[in-house]
């Protein structure tokens, strides 16, 4: 590898230090850079003609995107990780201690170690470009800022703001960064370097105090007040993480100790906590997700196939799903979308859906009204098949009715070109059955989004036996442009995500009928690590939707998918969930606090009894999901354990700190999982029978990774 840092001297005495990692599109910090930076800093100290220093990136749209995560996996022990953090401290302290002004000129991603580098500079100026974002997202990998970030950030922007940034991993836009005091100036990219040079020539400036509310001044200005901030943050973290993620509590401790005992002590605590987190099983799991998604971005979904460019999309159906799909097509992918619905109400719903989402951006000052209107102009509507002939892809989002979908296929083949892809958003019907109506079955594919479309990151791309590789590759590329994480799955009832979810939900329903309360069931699975409990999820998705999917899965996959009788009783009482304000929970203006509708127990003919241990409740639901995930792998529904992990995490919120179903099975041990399943099989019947692959793995002590 060639040199990453290049020092040039200007006639006015300002030196420019340009960072440009050879052979990479983005700058990342690597352990081997330490000696190179130290040598340059020594050179600067020796040269009395240098009056100031500007740090800038040689990359097009990246300042420094963070530390190279792969170097953490090279750490064999906590001691190795601690040494990495301490090396960063030495270099950044040396930079900060220079007796000349040091200015960071920031354009593009300035994240993690990149922001910590900028914080070690005396001043920061950033471009006003939309690509410029600043943040410390380490917590999302189960880590904390290990290059002095837990110490410098609170001292610059205040404790409350710094904790918010570090505990959420949120990324800050330029104007917001200026307002909070994170940067000293925001300028157009064209004059970024010039401005940074002028700042360096002006000399070290005394930092302007960040404007704080009176409450914040009182809290952050006294030891008693700071204790209130830290205690409140700790309570919120405990509630949010359920004790499953160690990083947030350690971030709070770093800041607390640094403020109370000084910078040096704070850095020592930071290095120690960073090291503990690097070797924690939670961070290892979260980093595995990061590497998996990074790897997947390089794949087309079909080996050797080249995706066609999608210049125009048509969405059939303007309902909740159709409106969401049209919205991400225009706003994220910037691809024109024509929405077709049989009535004007559906079309106005789709337009309103997209407008509301974009207008939120305007209200938050993330975009201008003109930018919103330009994106809205990409969406057009029709009640007939007009203006659809040149569509490259048609996404069907109509009712789950096979005859209706057959009609859609025939209509599109008649109205559109021979190359047009027909992508069905069905959640349960096998794609092969939909393709039976097609004269060009190679163009038919499944594209299963999750609700709400703009928030849920996963899509399942479902290939049936005759889907062409080019159709798969084009659909995968289209989904990525929409900002989605696609996994390619093979055809079959429920595909992957709904198939593993169905057994999990069925088991929760069984526990409910056995006398477990609604609240206890939901709390048990939230404590396990799911974002919401299974009963809340059923209310959100729709009890009627669950009732429609279950018979399809039972018919195709067998008795173990038979849903408990609860569905029929609930639907007879017109309980569909949130959508009609009547489900397991109370809805409406009167029920601000989430409360169970106690009348649901009477409808089900049950009376809540003694609650089981939360861990036992969660285990019964989760082992069903794990067993079925392995069946899906064995049947070729998913291509790899990696895809199964990503599908479960991004599709249904499987706890990320466990790494996904397959990583979790490795943690448990296949032999232990088989024992648990066999114990439940004895107690509750054959729906718990371990699949053959799990039994074989248990016998061989085999692992997935």
UniProtKB/Swiss-Prot annotation:
Its main location: cytoplasm. It catalyses: a (3S)-3-hydroxyacyl-CoA = a (2E)-enoyl-CoA + H2O; a 4-saturated-(3S)-3-hydroxyacyl-CoA = a (3E)-enoyl-CoA + H2O; a (3S)-3-hydroxyacyl-CoA + NAD(+) = a 3-oxoacyl-CoA + NADH + H(+); (3S)-3-hydroxybutanoyl-CoA = (3R)-3-hydroxybutanoyl-CoA. Residues 308-705 are annotated as: 3-hydroxyacyl-CoA dehydrogenase. Pathway: Lipid metabolism; fatty acid beta-oxidation. Residues 1-188 are annotated as: Enoyl-CoA hydratase. Keywords: Cytoplasm, Fatty acid metabolism, Isomerase, Lipid degradation, Lipid metabolism, Lyase, Multifunctional enzyme, NAD, Oxidoreductase. The keyword Ligase does not apply. Its EC number is 4.2.1.17, 5.1.2.3, 1.1.1.35. It comes from the Bacteria. The record marks 116, 138 as: Important for catalytic activity. GO terms for cellular component: cytoplasm. One of its GO terms (molecular function) is long-chain-3-hydroxyacyl-CoA dehydrogenase activity. One of its GO terms (biological process) is fatty acid beta-oxidation. SUPFAM superfamilies: 6-phosphogluconate dehydrogenase C-terminal domain-like, ClpP/crotonase, NAD(P)-binding Rossmann-fold domains. PANTHER family: TRIFUNCTIONAL ENZYME SUBUNIT ALPHA (PTHR43612), TRIFUNCTIONAL ENZYME SUBUNIT ALPHA, MITOCHONDRIAL (PTHR43612:SF3). Heterotetramer of two alpha chains (FadJ) and two beta chains (FadI). HAMAP family: FadJ. Catalyzes the formation of a hydroxyacyl-CoA by addition of water on enoyl-CoA. Also exhibits 3-hydroxyacyl-CoA epimerase and 3-hydroxyacyl-CoA dehydrogenase activities. This is Fatty acid oxidation complex subunit alpha. It comes from Shewanella oneidensis (strain ATCC 700550 / JCM 31522 / CIP 106686 / LMG 19005 / NCIMB 14063 / MR-1). The lineage of its organism: Bacteria, Pseudomonadati, Pseudomonadota, Gammaproteobacteria, Alteromonadales. The gene is fadJ.
């Amino acid at each position: 590898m060639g040199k990453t840092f290049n020092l040039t001297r200007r006639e006015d005495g300002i030196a420019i230090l340009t960072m440009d990692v050879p052979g990479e599109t983005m700058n990342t910090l690597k352990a081997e850079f330490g000696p190179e930076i130290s040598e340059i800093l020594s050179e600067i100290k020796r040269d009395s003609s240098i009056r100031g220093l500007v740090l800038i990136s040689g990359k097009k749209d990246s300042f420094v995107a963070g530390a190279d995560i792969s170097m953490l996996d090279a750490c064999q022990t906590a001691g190795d990780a601690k040494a990495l953090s301490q090396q960063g401290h030495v270099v950044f302290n040396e930079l900060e201690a220079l007796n000349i002004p040091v200015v960071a000129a920031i354009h593009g991603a300035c994240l993690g170690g990149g922001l910590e580098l900028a914080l070690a500079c005396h001043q920061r100026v950033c471009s006003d470009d939309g690509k410029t974002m600043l943040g410390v997202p380490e917590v999302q990998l189960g880590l904390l800022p290990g290059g002095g970030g837990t110490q410098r950030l609170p001292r610059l922007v205040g404790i409350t703001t710094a904790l918010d940034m570090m505990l959420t991993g949120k990324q800050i836009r330029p104007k917001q960064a200026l307002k909070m005091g994170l940067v000293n100036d925001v300028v157009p990219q064209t004059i970024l370097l010039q401005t940074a040079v002028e700042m360096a020539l002006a000399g070290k400036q005394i930092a302007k105090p960040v404007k704080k509310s009176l409450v914040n001044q009182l809290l952050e200005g006294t030891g008693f007040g700071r204790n209130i901030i830290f205690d409140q943050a700790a309570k919120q973290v405990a509630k949010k993480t359920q004790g499953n993620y160690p990083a947030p509590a350690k971030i709070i401790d770093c800041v607390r100790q640094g403020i109370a005992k000084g910078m040096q002590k704070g850095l020592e605590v930071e290095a120690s906590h960073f090291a503990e987190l690097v070797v924690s099983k939670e961070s290892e799991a979260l980093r595995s997700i990061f590497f998996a998604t990074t790897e997947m971005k390089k794949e087309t979904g079909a080996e050797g196939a080249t995706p066609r460019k999608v210049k125009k999309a048509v969405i059939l159906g303007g309902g909740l799903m159709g409106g969401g799909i049209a919205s991400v097509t225009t706003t994220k992918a910037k691809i024109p979308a024509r929405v077709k619905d049989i009535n004007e109400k559906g079309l106005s719903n789709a337009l309103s859906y997209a407008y509301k989402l974009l207008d939120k951006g305007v209200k938050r000052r993330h975009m201008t009204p003109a930018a919103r209107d330009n994106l809205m102009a990409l969406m057009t509507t029709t009640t007939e098949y007009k203006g659809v002939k040149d569509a490259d892809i048609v996404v069907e989002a109509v009712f789950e009715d096979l005859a209706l979908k057959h009609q859609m296929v025939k209509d599109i083949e008649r109205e559109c070109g021979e190359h047009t892809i027909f992508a069905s958003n069905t959640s349960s019907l096998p794609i092969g059955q939909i393709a039976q109506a097609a004269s060009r079955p190679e163009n038919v594919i499944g594209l299963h989004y999750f609700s709400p479309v703009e928030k849920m990151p996963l899509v399942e791309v479902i290939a049936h036996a005759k889907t062409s590789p080019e159709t798969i590759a084009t659909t995968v590329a289209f989904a990525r442009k929409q900002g989605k994480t696609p996994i390619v799955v093979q055809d079959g009832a429920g595909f992957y995500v709904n198939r593993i979810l169905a057994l999990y939900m069925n088991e929760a329903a069984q526990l409910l009928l056995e006398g477990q309360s609604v609240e206890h069931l939901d709390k048990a699975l939230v404590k396990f690590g799911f974002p919401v409990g299974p009963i809340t999820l059923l209310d959100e998705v729709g009890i009627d939707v669950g009732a429609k999917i279950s018979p399809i899965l039972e018919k195709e996959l067998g008795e173990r998918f038979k849903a408990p009788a609860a569905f029929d009783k609930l639907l007879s009482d017109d309980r569909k969930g949130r959508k009609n304000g009547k489900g397991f929970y109370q809805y409406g203006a009167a029920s601000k606090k989430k409360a169970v509708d106690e009348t649901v127990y009477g409808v089900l003919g049950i009376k809540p009894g003694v609650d089981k241990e939360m861990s036992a409740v969660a285990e019964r639901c989760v082992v069903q999901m794990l067993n079925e995930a392995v069946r899906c792998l064995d049947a070729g529904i998913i291509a790899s354990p990696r895809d199964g992990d990503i599908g479960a995490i991004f599709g249904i919120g499987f706890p990320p700190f466990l790494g996904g179903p397959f990583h979790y099975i490795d943690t448990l041990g296949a032999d232990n999982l088989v024992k648990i399943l066999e114990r439940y099989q004895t107690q509750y019947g054959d729906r718990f029978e371990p699949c053959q692959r799990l039994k074989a793995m248990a016998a061989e002590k085999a692992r997935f990774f």
